[in-house]
A protein has these predicted regions:
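Glycine-rich flavin
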Residues: 6, 13-16, 32-39, 44-175, ...
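Flexible, glycine-rich terminal cap/loop adjacent to redox cofactors
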Residues: 21-29, 33-47, 59, 63-70, ...
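Glycine-rich dinucleotide-binding loop and its adjacent helix/turn
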Residues: 58, 146-201, 205, 280-282, ...
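FAD-site-proximal beta/loop scaffold in flavoenzymes
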Residues: 161-176, 258-332
Length: 454
């Protein structure tokens, strides 16, 4: 083979139908779906194969929470059949977590290769409309899909270099005695729950008096009361201005506020991984909310799409949403059609107890009392919760008066994360109480309570 023929063969090998940038849940689903449709696909990942969720996000967090939940269950039944509550052995729990996460990178990569999907590891950077550089390689495609996700935001304050992130927390070898979370979103609440159960003195600092602003204010207050009773301190209306290293730890300062701690986690939101891609070179725009896309998930460049957490869409940034968008876009790139239409999306805070919501929100419903009724229920003494000594179980369920259909549910309980999926089905499929009563559900289970919540 002469040199020119070799160059031509190499160039052709670098041409694909679709290049997917990002090897997380969205990108992997995208690549697998396109490959199944007969497309030639290259997937590029700059960090860990598998992405945030299984490596340093929802999955390892839930593994750590498993011990927290078991400990809490034993505590609730003290004097009611159990004697002595277990303590969390953090190094052993972390080893359990790593037993799962350590295999994600290689397992994901091998899974892609097993599907005969081409892979590249490195930072992708658009050079022009038809050239994407990955290290010293240059590839091109008919279409590109950006699925690079998000990363934790770091507040730009004096001493910001002392901030650690959720990534660091989920891989701690030892739990410090004092842990502080700056930011009262779901990440701060969830990791605070874990740290507190593991024996740390925990503070959650938030800049106003409304943490978890996307959730029902009343049930957020109930959750905070429960977490406070467990020993977590909430410092509201506090804007941290500086972090200083001292002989006794890390000192956080704000107006009329000082706190010394051992570990400071920035839990003040997440930002899109869009700034290293060279998007300006191809006419694609983004801001702190993500890459701008239309209702076909298409950017300003007609051959570049964005899905998952990196895209600016009107839905929560969640792994199942990313998967939904990937499935939609596989269809759009193979058989173009209708704009994306999202189903109802449940959101949750895996604290103790758990707070979940799906639908239009009770607050929105109260603005239209002629259209909706809001059922507010204290379920704490119901059998489902009494049997394991639950401290509280609350619900707000919104029903449309005209149709009798549930349009929103917000729940606070130890089994709320299971209940919310039932409500998601009820809302999405427009199930009325008579519809539900025509079913026979297993009893006694949380699902058998549904008919009493309409």
């Amino acid at each position: 083979m002469v040199a020119n023929e070799f160059k031509e063969e190499f160039r052709m090998a670098e041409q694909y139908d679709v290049v997917v940038i990002g090897g997380g849940p969205a990108g992997n689903a995208m690549a697998s779906g396109l490959k199944a449709q007969g497309k030639t696909v290259l997937i590029v990942e700059a960090d860990l194969w598998g992405g945030t969720c299984p490596n340093r996000g929802c999955d390892p967090k839930k593994i750590l929470l498993s011990a927290v939940e078991a400990r809490q269950a034993a505590q609730h039944l003290q004097g009611q059949g159990l004697i002595g509550a277990p303590k969390i052995d953090w190094p052993a729990l972390m080893a359990h977590k790593r037993g799962y996460t350590d295999g994600i990178n290689d397992g994901t990569l091998n899974g892609l290769k097993g599907q005969d999907i081409a892979t590249l590891h490195g930072q992708a950077h658009f050079q022009s409309d038809n050239q994407l550089a990955v290290g010293d390689r240059v590839v091109s495609a008919t279409d590109y899909v950006v699925a690079t996700g998000q990363r934790p935001a770091i507040l730009p304050i004096t001493g910001h270099e002392y901030f650690k992130t959720s990534t660091d927390f989920l891989d701690l070898d030892q739990m410090p005695k004092r842990v502080t979370f700056v930011g009262g979103g779901y990440v701060g609440f969830e990791l605070a729950t874990i740290a507190n159960a593991a024996g740390a003195d925990v503070h959650v600092i938030h800049h106003n008096d409304r943490p978890l602003k996307a959730f029902d204010a009343d049930l957020v207050k109930d959750l905070m009361a429960a977490m406070t009773a467990d020993g977590i301190t909430f410092d509201l209306n506090t804007d941290v201005q500086a972090i200083t290293k001292t002989a006794t730890g890390l000192q956080l300062t704000a107006d009329n506020f000082e706190l010394t701690t051992d570990l400071v986690i920035s839990s003040a939101g997440r930002i899109p991984n869009a700034d290293q891609l060279g998007l300006a070179n191809v006419g694609v725009t983004f801001d702190r909310h993500g890459i701008q896309v239309n209702d076909h998930l298409q950017t300003a460049n007609p051959h570049i799409y964005a899905i998952g957490d990196v895209s600016d869409t009107p839905v929560p940034k969640l792994t199942p949403v990313a998967g939904f968008e990937a499935r939609y876009l596989v269809g759009e790139l193979t058989h173009p059609g209708a704009a994306i239409k999202y189903p109802v999306v449940p959101t949750q805070v895996f604290a103790a107890p758990k707070l979940v919501q799906v639908g239009i929100s009770a607050a929105a419903a109260t603005e239209h009392p002629d259209e909706y009724r809001v059922n507010i229920l204290d379920m704490t003494k119901w059998f489902t919760y009494y049997r394991f000594g639950a401290q509280q179980a609350q619900a707000k369920v919104v029903v449309a008066k005209a149709s009798g259909q549930v349009v929103d549910a917000t729940l606070l309980s130890d089994v709320a994360d299971e209940m919310i999926n039932y409500f998601t089905l009820l809302i999405e499929k427009n199930v009325t109480l008579p519809d539900l009563q025509r079913l026979v559900l297993a009893y006694p289970t949380p699902a058998s309570d549904l008919q009493y919540l309409y």
